[in-house]
Amino acid sequence: SQITGLEPGITYEYQAMAGTVAAKETKQFTTEAPAQLPNAGFEDWHGSSPLYIYKSGGEMFWDSGNTGSDTMNKNVTTYDATIKHSGNYSAKLQSQYVALFGIGAFAAGNVFVGKFLKIDGTDGILRFGRPFTSRPSKLVLYYRYVAGTVDYSTLSELPKNSKDMGSIYIALGDWPHQTFEGETDIPVLVKTKPADRQLFDSNSSNVIGYGECILKESTEGEGLIKLEIPINYRSNRKPTDIILVGSASRYGDYFTGSTGSTLWLDDLELIYE
């Protein structure tokens, strides 16, 4: 059974009941502290080539594919001062074909909790995840999505001339930490190079809670709309890390999607019930 309506960060006492008779022993439990995501309104940015999603001198929590696309003189993820929910900016994730001197690849507009670690040719090696120990019940955010027509494809599941799809997913887990070239405590190491591909697995036994929304249609109008993504828990274990990814092209890791796809995100909030 599940109890709702409890206040976060509060210690409660309870007694077991046998019919109408209460047990003599009283026990306690403490509800989760309502931890939130840093820079969840995407107000803080710095740099230009590449553009980073945190203020100068601050601590990185979010990153994007800009480190990779910058080698081709483009940022796939930028801020937008015109299409937003509140504050000064939203994050604008715009899928593009990035090329320089005839060499290039399709790159999905994306944002993720973690860090872009290394460029490997036209591919990337990424850290997914940051420390996080709470158990939110859902993710609430505001978004706008424009789904373009697929013009780059390596997958039969999403061929050229079909409609692109975006995605937003969140995972809480207790992944064994890895190390890569000086970067320590990596929850999930992602490699997009086809010969060495290593992607996030939502079915991993280390995933404690997971929620996802696949964006199959463009949203109506030019404003952002509210979206709630429930987080389904598979275990009562306490997580050690959080992963959150938004992408204008769901299959961008396979260099598949549309250069006409754009996803705006703003005001992400974790809800505790």
Name what the model sees in each region.
Residues T26-T71:
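Extracellular carbohydrate-recognition regions
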Residues H177-P239, S258:
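Extracellular carbohydrate recognition and processing domains
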Residues G102-E181:
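Extracellular-facing segments of soluble proteins and assemblies that are Gly/Ser/Thr-biased and enriched
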Residues A81-F101:
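Short carbohydrate-recognition loop motifs
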Residues M17-V21, S247-S249:
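Beta-strand-rich extracellular modules
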Residues R250-Y272:
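Extracellular carbohydrate recognition
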Residues I3-I10:
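Surface-exposed, short loops/turns at beta-strand junctions within beta-sandwich domains
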